[in-house]
Amino acid sequence: MKKIITRFRAYQLGNAGSSFSYFADNHFTLIEARLTEVNKETLKSELKICCKSQIDCLHITSWDQDHCSVQQLKEILETYLPKRIEFPGYTPHTESGKESLQVIKKYLRSMEKKKKIIAQSITPEYITSLDNATEFGYNNILHHPKFISNNSNDNSTIKHFRKGSFNVLSLGDVESSMISSSLSRQKTTQKETDVMILAH
């Protein structure tokens, strides 16, 4: 197993919601678009420890406000200039979700002439287009959504971060027992999960 400097951080927000980061192989991912007065300084400190001034990837699992706040999303984009944004593949049904999607599109337009930004909607079609995962590899795995459900929580993105010396499985807000059963049968999740971010 190759040595890779790897860090995982869970941030307190001071209110309902979630915020995490995963750093591996000099790549910093912020999980969820949340930035409050409580986690601002800790995020800044974590980036400094990782010798980073910008975020490489902003990974948003759900359009719900506790995962993606419109104003906080704007601040993250303006302050940390992520090179890649991974956002939910289902159509937002709330006003805050719809506005958040427009904020991402506006950011892409504003950065068009400055640098290349990749924005990827994590849809079932996108997941199907990816290569099959191999065991004990160093590539991340997107497990879900493999279909669009009537329950928006079950459309959350499930991602297995496997770029580092330890792995993190992020479950978004998925509630379905069918999805959890399918996930638990995967050899990669059985054998390669060190940290699990539970649905809440």
PLM regions and their residue ranges:
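Residue-level detector of solvent-exposed, low-hydrophobicity positions
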Residues: 27, 69-70, 114, 133
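Metallo-beta-lactamase
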Residues: 55-66, 196-200
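Active-site HxH/HxHxD metal-binding segment of metal-dependent hydrolases
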Residues: 57, 65-112
